[in-house]
Amino acid sequence: RQMCIRDRDKHDYGKGFYLTENIELAKEWAVCRPTETNGWVHKYELDISDLKILDFQKYDVLSWLAELMKHRDAADTKRYKVLSKKFIEKFGIDTSTYDVIKGWRANASYFYIAKEFVRDNVDTDILEELLSLGGLGIQYCIKSELAYSKLTENKKGSIRVEYSVFNDKYNQRDVRARENMHDLIESDANKVTNVFSTLF
């Protein structure tokens, strides 16, 4: 399985090595920070035999949000700090025994969903549809030494990424996603009945 990678120390699923199978998204992620410097995409192959993989796409979206809350704060209020602990206890998954975690990448627009959700502005019935609007891709997080040992770099596959081209694509994608998400949140489809604070 060939993957493109951008290394992160701390991110959505905690400390690990983050990859995607989508090379175009990898290019955008390589230059998504406002440093105005060109980036690189490195290609790796991951042998997934004998690896224990947690795929958040196979679980309720609330489990993914709980994992996100473990590592990133969606708000800094007392209410959020109290309720997020309860939310994680109820919907969280113990990821400590997994070699690889697969799931959505919580980029700016995805994190916008999380913030609106904890403010009780989003009904759980539209959460999955909201996630589909971002178009920001699926990522893999390499968590264990065993998984690291099964990574092989394609040294001839590195690609230089122009900041001026792909940072603009990244920003345009994010703007479109936020607009689409905002429209859905403000639509009649969002009943605002089954919300964050009602789930305990």
Could you tell me what each predicted segment is?
Residues 1-5:
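Short, small-residue-biased leader/transition segments that mark boundaries at the very start
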Residues 7, 11-12, 32-38, 43-200:
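Conserved NAD+-utilizing ADP-ribose enzyme module
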Residues 13-18:
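A short, exposed loop/beta-hairpin motif centered on an aromatic-Gly-Thr core
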